[in-house]
């Protein structure tokens, strides 16, 4: 059964991993390998189906139903996804969530929130997120839906 504490842990882990990927990259580490590890630990690509709509995608590559597509969005460098620049490589030095709301439904948590990103250059953006987290049979929490968009600007 999913709990409120598990929602906050899952969201904080997601935010922390964004910072960690950028740090690995900035320190000359293998950001691609680290991102693959994060994808395996945090998303259900290896065992199931994931619905992922990154913030800055469009056209034929708007949705990323494969681990390869998600990895490309996070770290770039894949010629099959020429518009991906590696969103997580900026690096982001601080990432946090706010204004979360959620529905707990058995082994699922359906979550909406804002996520704020502070760049090394002190830039600040925030995006609207929707996640569905699943409590898997092995006790691990995995993302099965991740939707991200920029706030509407009239």
Residue positions per predicted region:
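Basic/polar N-terminal segments that are highly enriched at the extreme N-terminus
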Residues: 1-16, 151-154
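Conserved aromatic-histidine-acidic binding/catalytic patches
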Residues: 2-6, 103, 121
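Mature soluble binding/inhibitory domains
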Residues: 4, 8, 21-25, 49, ...
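N-terminal membrane-sensor/transducer module of prokaryotic signaling receptors
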Residues: 10, 16-36, 147
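N-terminal, helix-rich and Lys/Arg-enriched segments in bacterial and organellar proteins
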Residues: 18, 22, 37-43, 111-115, ...
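A solvent-exposed, acidic/Ser-Thr-rich amphipathic alpha-helical stretch
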Residues: 25-99
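Short beta-strand edge/turn micro-motifs at domain boundaries
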Residues: 104-112, 116, 120-154
